């Protein structure tokens, strides 16, 4: 399960998406996420699905990596579907005691589950096609106009970058500790939920110690390199908008406009 969590991992490549400006990718992702919540009909969801599959194809990221990113959240997806299945009023398809399944419940549950799948796929695509350093530069550039209002743009971007970088590291550390505990007879797979939660305590304690140790080592390394924040810092590669960014914007805006049109006509 831990090896299936891919948040923060970068997939090297030279695709159209890899070469887009990180600012453009972040903005396009935010616009497309908004477009997902505009979708309400079968045809609008079909359009979103087709555009997302086309984006994945253009990115060069294997579809199995997107599926791998979705797998750890299967419980949330199933729970979302069940909640809407049993709580949405409408045309009754099945009724037995407290179980009341409606046609609208099935449709609503499917749509809400698809929205979550789309959100996971989009966030995964962003991190797969953008290295942590480039993503940090993009976030910092987008936050820079807010510095006049006292927003610490560089510090926030650096925190996000470190957090994304540490996720795979901590997952690897967790997996290593669990294997070490299992070799000593620990069981993490059997028993009820409470038993499994208690069995994780021997994992959490060394994990927290390891996390604090790594954080201290990182702070020491940054101080040794005279890190003093973003003031006066220069970058090896300057961010620059290109024609491919305009194409990306145009495609996302066009799909969003179509979804708004479908919503207004439905």
Label each residue range with its predicted role.
Residues 41, 45, 60-64, 88-96, ...:
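Transmembrane helix-loop junctions in multipass membrane proteins, especially transporters and channels
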Residues 1-44, 48-57, 141-151, 155-158, ...:
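Transmembrane alpha-helix interface motif
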């Amino acid at each position: 399960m831990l090896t299936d969590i891919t948040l923060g991992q970068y997939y090297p490549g030279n695709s159209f998406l890899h070469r887009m400006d990180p600012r453009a990718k972040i903005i396009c992702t935010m616009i497309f996420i908004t477009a997902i919540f505009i979708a309400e009909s079968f045809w609008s969801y079909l359009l979103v699905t087709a555009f997302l599959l086309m984006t994945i194809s253009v990115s060069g990221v294997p579809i199995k990596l997107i599926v791998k990113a979705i797998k750890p959240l299967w419980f949330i997806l199933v729970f979302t579907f069940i909640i809407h299945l049993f709580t949405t009023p409408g045309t009754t398809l099945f009724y037995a005691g407290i179980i009341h399944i409606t046609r609208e419940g099935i449709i609503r549950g499917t749509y809400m589950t698809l929205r979550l799948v789309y959100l996971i796929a989009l966030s995964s695509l962003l991190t797969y096609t953008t290295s942590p350093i480039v993503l940090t530069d993009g976030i910092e550039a987008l936050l820079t106009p807010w510095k006049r209002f006292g927003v610490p743009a560089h510090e926030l971007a650096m925190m996000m970058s470190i957090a994304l970088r540490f996720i795979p590291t901590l997952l690897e550390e967790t997996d290593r500790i669990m294997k070490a505990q299992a070799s000593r007879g620990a069981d993490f797979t059997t028993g009820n939920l409470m038993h499994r939660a208690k069995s994780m305590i021997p994992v959490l304690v060394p994990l927290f110690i390891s996390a604090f140790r790594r954080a201290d080592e990182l702070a020491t390394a940054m101080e040794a390199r005279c890190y003093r924040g973003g003031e006066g810092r220069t970058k090896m590669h300057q961010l620059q908008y290109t024609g491919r960014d305009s194409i990306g914007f145009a495609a996302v805006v066009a799909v969003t406009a179509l979804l708004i049109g479908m919503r207004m006509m439905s």
